[in-house]
Regions:
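Conserved phosphate- and dinucleotide-binding cores of soluble alpha/beta proteins
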Residues: 2-14, 19-32, 37-43, 49-57, ...
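Glycine/charged-rich beta-loop-alpha catalytic/anionic-binding loops adjacent to active sites
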Residues: 19, 26, 77-84, 137-143
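A short, small-residue-rich loop immediately preceding and capping a beta-strand
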Residues: 31-32, 110-117
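HTH-adjacent hinge/linker in prokaryotic transcriptional regulators
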Residues: 43-112, 125-135, 147-155, 167
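Glycine-rich beta-strand-to-loop/alpha-helix junction loops that act as flexible
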Residues: 82, 115-120, 307
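Nucleotide donor/acceptor-binding cores
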Residues: 110-111, 135-137, 181, 276
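Structural beta-sheet core signal
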Residues: 115, 139-141, 173, 280
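Short Gly/Thr/Asp-enriched flexible loops that form oxyanion-binding sites at enzyme active sites
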Residues: 120-131, 220-229
């Protein structure tokens, strides 16, 4: 243990630094001590229990879950919201709010930002703050439009346009569907100048915001609204766990070819993986296998989810 003079000095430095908010340089000048000595004595004060730092985890009760999921899957960022006792709409709104804060924090001037479709992505876009000034962002869809009658608020073009308006960015929209009747039609659209313009942005994507689908929810209204009458019986037979932008994968993250693959117009997963940030937003036990597959395949490097889903991911 230090002698009494050393302890008195450590206490004095700690009081100036932590309670009076003086910088280490200011303390060094006031006490006539090298700044490196100030730093060393502050560390010694913490190590010996002279100084203790308390964090009020009531403000983020899910921090442990976030850290564990981040470490387990090697992610860049994780946001876990509470709400296990809340209804689904409330939990989704909370995910949208905190996801919007994450996206806004990660964006850099000049970024190309890609959007998929769906309820979760819509919840995030709705909660984006109105930008005070432009960051010269370019917002683009990374999948075509629905085959069925999807609610406009979940449509990829609606989300892309709305996000660009809030972020004071530039938007480009998709005038092609995600699923075509046959590969010949798809290949023809891929030769169009419009598609080439959109796909060029996919090649240089900086940030992506995606929902995660699962065959477990294919009886839901939004699945039918997006895919229309497209045959999907082969998904279970091929052990599909989930999809991002209608690109299907198994629970290990390996891509799975389906009868839709050659008729799909959306970003390819190798391009999605090249983005600086690929943010997945999803929750629920039904989507668990899809989320796990997306994480294992490294198709996303950031995750926004709820606490019950995060707990499942750690089992």
């Amino acid at each position: 243990m230090e002698n009494s003079d050393d302890i008195r000095l450590i206490v004095k430095i700690a009081q100036l630094y932590y309670e009076q908010d003086m910088t280490q340089a200011q303390i060094a000048r006031e006490l006539g001590i090298y700044r490196t000595t100030i730093s060393r004595l502050l560390k010694r004060g913490r190590d010996q229990g002279i100084v203790t730092i308390a964090i009020n985890y009531d403000y983020n009760e899910n921090l442990w879950l976030e850290q564990q999921v981040k470490q387990k899957f090697g992610l860049k960022d994780v946001v876990v919201v509470s709400g296990n006792d809340e209804d689904e709409d409330t939990q989704l709104a909370m995910m949208g709010l905190h996801g919007a804060q994450l996206l806004d924090r990660l964006l850099e001037p000049g970024d190309i930002v890609g959007f998929s479709w769906g309820r979760a992505v819509s919840a995030l876009v709705e909660n984006l703050p109105q930008a005070g000034q432009s960051r010269q962002l370019i917002c683009v869809p990374i999948i075509g439009g629905p085959s069925g009658k999807l609610k406009s608020r979940y449509h990829v073009n609606t989300l892309t346009y709305s996000a660009a308006a809030k972020l004071k960015g530039e938007s480009h929209l998709a005038d092609f569907p995600a699923l075509l009747d046959n590969p010949l039609i798809r290949n023809g659209i891929m030769q169009s100048q419009h598609f080439k313009t959109i796909s060029a942005y996919w090649d240089n994507l900086d940030v992506a915001l995606v929902g995660i689908g699962s065959p477990a929810i294919r009886d839901g209204a939004n699945w039918h609204a997006f895919y229309g009458g497209e045959e999907s019986d082969d998904l279970n037979a091929r052990q599909v766990a989930g999809d991002i932008c209608s690109r299907f994968f198994d629970i290990h993250g390996a891509m799975v070819e389906t009868n839709m693959s050659e008729k799909t117009l959306s970003i390819e997963m190798n391009k999605l993986k090249q983005a600086r940030y690929s943010i997945g937003i999803a929750m629920s036990e039904e989507k668990y296998s899809g989320i796990v597959g997306a994480l294992r395949g490294k198709y996303i490097n950031c995750l926004v989810t709820n606490s019950s889903t995060a707990e499942l991911l750690l089992k």
